[in-house]
Each structure stands twice: as C-alpha cells, then as structure tokens.
Regions:
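Generic beta-strand/beta-sheet core signal
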Residues: 5-7, 109-112, 135-138, 161-164, ...
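Redox- and metal-dependent alpha/beta enzyme cores, enriched for Fe-S-associated oxidoreductases
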Residues: 103-130, 143-150
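A general structural motif
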Residues: 77-93, 110-118, 138-145
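Peripheral docking tails and interdomain loops at the edges
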Residues: 158-228
C-alpha cells in the first residue's frame, strides 16, 4: 500500500477547479483479484489468524536487510503504472517531473501544491529571458536518485530545495538532505545546493517569494513568507 498525500488543511479546504478521472479508464489498471486477496488478509474476528513473529538478535538484522531488493525495485514499478495512466488519460507523470527552460541554470526542487505557483512564476521569468526551472517530486519514498539526476538539465549551476517542514536540531530538512545525498557522487556534485522553508501553518507562498528564491545566490539557508 502507498500513502497518497497532499499539503494538508489549506489544500483540502479550498475551492478549486479539478479534473476527475473516469473509473472506467482506471479499473483496467487495477488487479481486482489481488485487491480482494489483500482485503481477505485483513484482521477479522470471524476468521482470526496470527500475525507477526518474535525474532532473536541472531536473525532480526538479516530479516530487515532482506527487504532491500523489494524497495530497490519499487520505483520502476511505480513508473510502469504512471506510464499506463499517462497512456490512458494523457497525463505526463514521472517519478520526477521537470518544468522550465531546457538550459536552466537555477532550478527549484519541491513537492506538493507549491509547484503550481512555481510554474506560473517560471513562465513569467522565462518570458523575461531567465534560465530557470523546477523539478517536481512525485514519488518521495523510495527516493530514486537516478530518476532525480535524469530530470535535472545538464546546464544547472544552482539548486534550491524547498521543504514545507522544520526539523529542529537536524542539519537540514528531509527533502534537502535527500537531494544532497542523491547528487553527491553524480555529475552535479559541484552544483551549489541551497535549502529553504516555506508555507508552515498554511502561510501563503506567493510568486514574488519564488522570484526571491531564484534571485538568491548567497544565502544557503533561508525561509520565505515571513515578513515581521
């Protein structure tokens, strides 16, 4: 099972135009027999079963490591189903979607509804000749480093990662740390990577703030949206 998530209260309580998918288009992509089998394994007093096991220290570590191949294979499975959806309803979902100039020099990496604002800002900046872009994260876990690398234009010189969370005491926020780790040994190892926070508590993120992110070339750690 996967957790499909969005940005919380603000997104779930706004009035917005949406496009719905016809279930007739999607039902062929779902293995209903597998879903029924999964549901039948649910805990039920009418057909009780025992779950879980106690593992001693001599085997627990091995059991935890044994699941690695399944997580390693998962991004390709997700992309396969994204391709099926794309073919069926005309979307263009990838693990990481890029939007912006093909020769961008400064890009943002972000996930969630802020990407709508970023895209509008990119259109404005590109019309003025700016070389900017954004990588939209579609699959966060498992994090596929190669898919991220493939989505970034070779011309990039600076990356600003936006996180909508704060991890007190940590060296950085989760998405930023993932991007740094993914690019460390790649062709982008010399690219400057900045980190910023935005939108906590449903604070507005405006196009002007996104412009400020693209114009920032000095402050490696920053916030946007706080005006006190």
């Amino acid at each position: 099972p996967f957790i499909n998530f969005f940005d919380g209260f603000r997104t779930s309580h706004e009035i917005q135009k949406i496009e719905t998918w016809d279930y007739e288009d999607l039902k062929d992509m779902a293995d209903m027999d597998a879903i029924a089998e999964f549901r039948n394994r649910a805990l039920n007093p009418n057909h009780p079963c025992q779950r879980g096991s106690a593992q001693n220290p001599d085997i627990f570590f091995q059991a935890r490591e044994a699941c690695n191949p399944y997580y390693d294979a998962l991004p390709a499975v997700v992309q396969e189903y994204m391709d099926k959806v794309n073919e069926k309803i005309g979307t263009d979902y990838k693990l990481f979607n890029y939007y912006g100039a093909a020769d961008a020099e400064h890009i943002i990496v972000a996930m969630g509804s802020v990407n709508d604002t970023i895209e509008e800002t990119i259109d404005y900046l590109m019309a003025a000749g700016k070389k900017v872009g954004v990588v939209k994260v579609r699959l966060y876990r498992p994090f596929c480093a190669q898919a991220l690398i493939d989505a970034i234009p070779d011309t990039v010189k600076q990356i600003s990662v936006l996180d909508r969370t704060k991890e007190p005491g940590a060296l950085g926020e989760p998405l930023y740390l993932d991007v740094v780790a993914a690019l460390r040994d790649s062709k982008f190892s010399d690219v400057k990577i900045f980190t910023g926070r935005y939108g906590l508590g449903s604070k507005d993120t405006t196009p002007a703030q996104i412009v400020a992110v693209y114009e920032n070339t000095e402050k490696e750690k920053f916030t946007i949206g706080i005006v006190d």
